[in-house]
Swiss-Prot record:
SMART domains: Ribosomal_S15 (SM01387). This is Small ribosomal subunit protein uS15. Belongs to the universal ribosomal protein uS15 family. GO terms for cellular component: cytosolic small ribosomal subunit. Keywords: Ribonucleoprotein, Ribosomal protein, RNA-binding, rRNA-binding. It comes from Bradyrhizobium sp. (strain ORS 278). Part of the 30S ribosomal subunit. Forms a bridge to the 50S subunit in the 70S ribosome, contacting the 23S rRNA. One of its GO terms (biological process) is translation. One of the primary rRNA binding proteins, it binds directly to 16S rRNA where it helps nucleate assembly of the platform of the 30S subunit by binding and bridging several RNA helices of the 16S rRNA.
Length: 89
């Protein structure tokens, strides 16, 4: 349930803070959110897939850590990111 290289490039372009930016928290959270959304769709039809569920929980935890970092360092960017990706907090 991974995302294609083209889709990943679109996400990076839409969320990059400058040219060539692939490591900023905004880009990382956007990519993780896309992967999480893909996996939640997978679980609607494969409810007993516990191995993938563990991977989903790991992705959510990683995204949560990045969001905590962003909130600690720049709350305005944090709030904008939550709003842009419709992430509940």
């Amino acid at each position: 349930m991974s995302i294609t290289a083209e889709r990943k490039a679109e996400i990076i372009k839409a969320n990059a803070t400058k040219a060539g930016d692939t490591g900023s928290p905004e880009v990382q959270v956007a990519i993780l959110s896309e992967r999480i959304n893909n996996l939640t769709g997978h679980f609607k039809t494969h409810g007993k897939d516990n191995h993938s569920r563990r991977g989903l929980l790991k992705l959510v935890s990683t995204r949560r850590s990045l969001l905590d970092y962003l909130k600690k360092n720049d709350e305005a960017r944090y709030k904008a990111l939550l709003e842009k990706h419709n992430i509940r907090r």
